[in-house]
């Protein structure tokens, strides 16, 4: 197993499948009366979040606690970071505390790589700028395999704001490694061809959502990150929804077995309607639940847990 999880590119097919298989074992813990394993007793996991996050931070905290690890949640607000402390000095503090693993979310792309150079423990990238979010890709792959029984050969449409999406980058890399066929869909300004080519030469690009729906096993809708863009990317929210939003009418053009995913948080009424988000095809709630199992697997394998 690798020492850090910084990018989906760190994972070959064998390692990725090992994580997914381990996650399936971890999922059985959720059904127990006592939802705990002693695997990481005595280990310390630090959640170092420089950006606000509800889903991801709580998911990692739950994962570590279910493995009996000691968890330290580091909040930037009110900390030395708010007073100007550098990432390196924070890393040295964590090193002195003996952190076995650091889960980091940071607004700067590449920050987890720097952190990995400064601490002896394992580093897990929980999202760095617009770069990557590998555990989200793993939980998405786990959800697809749970619903559809396989990953190899699946046709996956990743729709929306690819340009600003770390989730899209990690998913394209991981799904391509696992044999899925990925098509990026969205307005041309949000899918630069050079980005698609750099991510995975096998990924296709299409600017017409309606053209890809009948052939898609999975449609992954991305949040439109309006905080990272200006009005030049598309005319209006209404126009975006008309061209690239997934509503009930479009959902009915999907194959009968197809599923709809969204990493959250959603802009209901923009990239996805409530009819779709709350439908039986939607895996959005499952993705949250599966995230805990997948992150348990990642921490367990990175830290060499035992005594399951």
Swiss-Prot record:
Lineage: Bacteria, Bacillati, Actinomycetota, Actinomycetes, Micromonosporales
Keyword Signal annotated: no
Entry similarity comment: Belongs to the aspartate/ornithine carbamoyltransferase superfamily. ATCase family.
Enzyme Commission number: 2.1.3.2
Oligomer status and interactors: Heterododecamer (2C3:3R2) of six catalytic PyrB chains organized as two trimers (C3), and six regulatory PyrI chains organized as three dimers (R2).
GO molecular function: amino acid binding; aspartate carbamoyltransferase activity
Pathway it works in: Pyrimidine metabolism; UMP biosynthesis via de novo pathway; (S)-dihydroorotate from bicarbonate: step 2/3
Stated name of the protein: Aspartate carbamoyltransferase catalytic subunit
